[in-house]
């Protein structure tokens, strides 16, 4: 059977502990790509982080991020598919999370919007791509409705 595409999840599949990719995985991905098979990184993470790891393994195709809510060509503005959550629904989700004491991350292409300063620090460590400025991730901490409205307005098209 000849495959045209291989989709690889990141967390718990491609990435080992400490966010590393084994040499064996890199070698296998290169061999598959050299046979003309598209290698696509797929993840629940935001686009910039997925694209960063896609580069690390040498995948030159599209990236599927945010649990399928974003499909985008790397290093371009070409978005193949994007499904945003309505602004009012985001507000309701944030309000419910705050009332229940739940840490929340809302994603744009390159930004995490969170309701927790602790989560902010953890996310900076987990999603660090500081060695590649093309894939930097911003983190906005939102602690009240006014700030949430400001942030949602900034990212309304993202």
Regions inferred by a protein language model and the residue ranges of each:
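Structured loop/turn residues at beta-strand edges in well-structured enzyme cores
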Residues: 1, 57-59, 157
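Asp-based phosphoryl-transfer active-site loop
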Residues: 2-18, 93
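Short amphipathic alpha-helical segments
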Residues: 10, 77, 157-158
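An N-terminal domain-start capping segment
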Residues: 13-21, 127-130
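Short secondary-structure boundary/capping elements
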Residues: 20-24, 143
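Active-site phosphate-binding/coordination module
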Residues: 23-129
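Acidic, His- and aromatic-enriched active-site or binding-groove loops in soluble protein domains
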Residues: 121-148
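Short, intrinsically disordered, charge-balanced linker/junction segments flanking boundaries
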Residues: 145-158
């Amino acid at each position: 059977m000849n495959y045209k595409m291989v989709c690889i999840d990141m967390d718990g599949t491609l990435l080992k502990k400490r966010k590393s990719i084994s040499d064996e995985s890199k070698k296998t991905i290169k061999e598959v790509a050299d046979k003309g098979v598209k290698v696509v990184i797929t993840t629940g993470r935001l686009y910039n982080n997925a694209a960063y790891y896609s580069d690390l393994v040498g995948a030159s195709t599209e990236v599927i991020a945010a649990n399928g809510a974003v499909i985008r060509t790397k290093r371009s503005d070409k978005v193949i598919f994007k499904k945003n959550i309505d602004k009012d629904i985001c507000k309701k989700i944030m309000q419910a999370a705050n009332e229940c004491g739940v840490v929340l991350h809302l994603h744009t292409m390159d930004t995490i919007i969170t309701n927790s300063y602790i989560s902010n620090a953890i996310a900076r460590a987990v999603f660090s791509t500081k060695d590649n400025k093309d894939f930097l991730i911003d983190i906005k901490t939102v602690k009240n409705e006014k700030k949430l409205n400001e942030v949602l307005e900034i990212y309304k098209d993202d």
